[in-house]
Amino acid sequence: TQGVSSAASDVYKRQACWFWELEVIPSTWLRAIELVDEIMVASQFIESAFRHVTDKPIMRVPLPVSDLRDSGLQREDFGLPAGKFTFLFSFDFHSVAARKNPQAVVHAFQQAFPNKRDDVHLVLKSSNGHMYPEQMRELLALVVGDARIQLRDEVIDKMHVRALQRCCDVYVSLHRAEGFGLGLAECMSLGKPVIATGWSGNREFMTESNSVLVPYDLVPVAGRYPESEGAQWAEPKVARAADAMRRLADDPEYARAIGEAARRDVGLKLAPDRAAQAILFRTANVLAAS
């Protein structure tokens, strides 16, 4: 057994694929880092965080986005009003509402479009809200009385999620931090304009030319996220997000140009073949070195 273990340790590498949403890696992870040979991450943001705590090899492979089929559901199947310019934000309460920051999306929408304007619509697609009743009530209190805002809290099939993304016009994420931001990338791959906080992992694929990046201030997390001692995150400027929402709704050519750039760039940067080749290249190097 000792001989087999020794031989295996000479040939095999133990690699961990980790995600994290803040610039500071939790101290509770340090022991686990010691047990692996190298780390795989999906963004430069995560890579930078790990480089502060380890000198082990880090391979960066952005998450691939493939041309997945959706379920074929249409706007009416989701209760979306016909002919209204529709914004979408989706999140899971398990991912910590303070980080996802849905309240900022509501505030930006209502600042952008006073109540007298009824040609716009906002969908907040959440899941697991029933497990966080206090936070769910706070969100409901923001949207009550505004018939233009639709809050759907349910777990639906991934193919239905893709259909909902297709049915909406713009995706908005005023997150305080993201390790990568897969939902943003998925919407961009569909040619949807995306408005998002210009900080953290989504900068792996979002630029000033293929999306609308919202400026922010960095502020202490102050205990609003697990294992966040000493960390900071972004506070997006809601007024600037409101300006972006208004412009995309009122300027179809601008929205189309942003969406086309998004589709093109994500199709190149996050192509499945590109991720596969990076992994194969690293695997070949490990085998050659052994």
Language model: regions and residue ranges:
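Single conserved hydrophobic/aromatic residue that forms the stacking wall/gate
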Residues: T1-A8, Y12
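A short, well-ordered alpha-helix in the C-terminal region of glycosyltransferases
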Residues: R240-D243, R247, Y254-L268, N285
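Conserved donor-binding/catalytic core segment of Leloir-type glycosyltransferases
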Residues: P81-K100, V106-Q110, L122-L124
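C-terminal alpha-helical cap of glycosyltransferases
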Residues: P272-S290
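Nucleotide-activated donor-binding/catalytic signature segment of Leloir-type glycosyltransferases, i.e.
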Residues: E134-A163
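Aromatic "clamp/platform" in nucleotide-sugar-dependent glycosyltransferases that forms part
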Residues: R176
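Nucleotide-sugar donor-binding and catalytic loop/hinge architecture
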Residues: S71-F87, P114-R117, A289
